[in-house]
């Protein structure tokens, strides 16, 4: 594999990506000798060797960057065993040679498309923070604002159908769109099957090349739509024009690249139609923030974006459930609770100390309702989410008749009080078209937590049935992991501070159980009405003199 090794002296680590040591290797490629360089960082073999084509021996191939660096692995996918540094080098070199061979033969030519944005970044002179829906294949106008100051120039763009744009812009980018200059930006999706090589290092496409992309790689329908956009009355921008191209790539994704260019100075005439005098094309990258992209990027679920979930009770368990629904991609969440947030609860609540108090109109310090504090926090973290907060009890809302409960795709009950939840269960079962309803609760001292799904599909499942009386025994929850008739309540300063002991970890486990199965329900993957439980360790419970139930003892799974 290696025919010759020559050590390079006086290595500039800044030039060679942190490598302190460099060697020239003569290898055999397609039966002929070829030169490649390998670099080692100080901590080798604790890190992978880096390979460079410094002499441009292999021409332009995918995964080779402008400094000659050959990116042969996306991550530290190769397991490193420090005991065998030579084997590590040879293993990596095999991968590099295979990658180069595919590049020379053209076998991985489509990787140029897959890595288009990575190459594009090498030539850009600015950035657009863009919320672009790449699943929409129509030519269309995009909102775009430029914030300029003596030391800063920020360009932000968003689809016109994104709600609460001004709030989102202020939350994410700290700009006031009403104070910034607005420019026309047109999104142009290129035809499927379009093949465009990304620009080589430090190569910039000229006006003719960009116009050729526009002329040859969009559909007739797209051209007609483009003409309608630029001819709209009052829609011309004489100063600057922004264009964002969407290039379909083979993994069903879309690469984005953008330009800003001077306007034509003529109403209803775009620079891609008529070349302006002294045209200067400035390439821009697009940093994405569209909610669909962010959800796909982080494992969220776009299938539930149109779902509306209501959570009744946003204490320790309910608040964790609400925040996890927001992270999961549910775009409309209603939170219902008439309780206030208190300092006593923050260490097992999704909200922290800073959410407990606020000042009223008379500047008096007051406790904030849980739902209002939770709405504020979710909106701050996830501004795309629509949150409706109702600081009332379920009973109040039911008696008012102000809510059409069947409009919810899912109802989660996390009050943690059996009598109230049995009442809700009765009311839900009395409806003609009740929404699927899930009940969630913790048990004390880390022994477990539960989630009961009801009214899903065949409208079966009943919370109250868990408390069905048995002859000679008091009523108790038959799903419980604790023996009946035990009092777990504690107090620190008297009756006013009574609480049931469980930790934030218990609430998070129960919330995860609920949300995981709720997502299955909302996407049609869960058809029945199961009782689901997580089983914890019983050591603390027993150390305090309590006993477990037969269900806990007979269920050996945790």
Question: Where in the sequence are the language-model features?
Answer:
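N-terminal charged helix/coil linker that caps or initiates catalytic domains
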Residues: 255-309
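Conserved acidic residues
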Residues: 391-394
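Glycine-rich phosphate/adenylate-binding loop
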Residues: 122-267, 406-410, 414-558
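Domain-level detector for trafficking modules
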Residues: 65-76, 80-123
